[in-house]
């Protein structure tokens, strides 16, 4: 059996550009792509923390070190500059890979879209 698992996540990225008339996609700083194990043309889901919008597109490379998160084409209508988004990708993982310790790449960034930390799991949520 295979399971559809979280593979990559960039958490709380600030939208830096919205380019309505650019070919559709999401340009992501190449440093963030690599840290999250995302590749160019990979399908990504984007969840807008500010307005609740959830949509899919594909990743393209943004200038390395720029902090760029550019929503392009129709995706530009789903956010405003400065909105915080979560960018995620999923993968089909078989039971053997899971048993061998397969883990996602979770990237946490600061206000300037620079990497401030990594994790390989989401902590248990508590009621405290």
UniProtKB/Swiss-Prot annotation:
What name goes with this protein?
Aspartate 1-decarboxylase
What modifications does the entry list under PTM / processing?
A: Is synthesized initially as an inactive proenzyme, which is activated by self-cleavage at a specific serine bond to produce a beta-subunit with a hydroxyl group at its C-terminus and an alpha-subunit with a pyruvoyl group at its N-terminus.
What species does this protein belong to? Burkholderia ambifaria (strain ATCC BAA-244 / DSM 16087 / CCUG 44356 / LMG 19182 / AMMD) (Burkholderia cepacia (strain AMMD))
The chain residues annotated with the modification Pyruvic acid (Ser) are 25
Report any one BP term from Gene Ontology. Answer: pantothenate biosynthetic process
Q: What's the source species' lineage?
A: Bacteria, Pseudomonadati, Pseudomonadota, Betaproteobacteria, Burkholderiales
Q: What role is this protein assigned? A: Catalyzes the pyruvoyl-dependent decarboxylation of aspartate to produce beta-alanine.
Indicate where this protein is primarily found. Answer: cytoplasm
Task: Please give an example of a GO cellular component term from this record.
Answer: cytosol
* Cited InterPro entries: Asp_de-COase-like_dom_sf, Asp_decarbox
- Cofactor stoichiometry and binding remark: Binds 1 pyruvoyl group covalently per subunit.
Which keywords does this Swiss-Prot/TrEMBL entry list?
Autocatalytic cleavage, Cytoplasm, Decarboxylase, Lyase, Pantothenate biosynthesis, Pyruvate, Schiff base, Zymogen
Cofactor(s) needed by this chain: pyruvate
Instruction: Write down the PANTHER family for this protein, in alphabetical order.
Output: ASPARTATE 1-DECARBOXYLASE (PTHR21012:SF0)
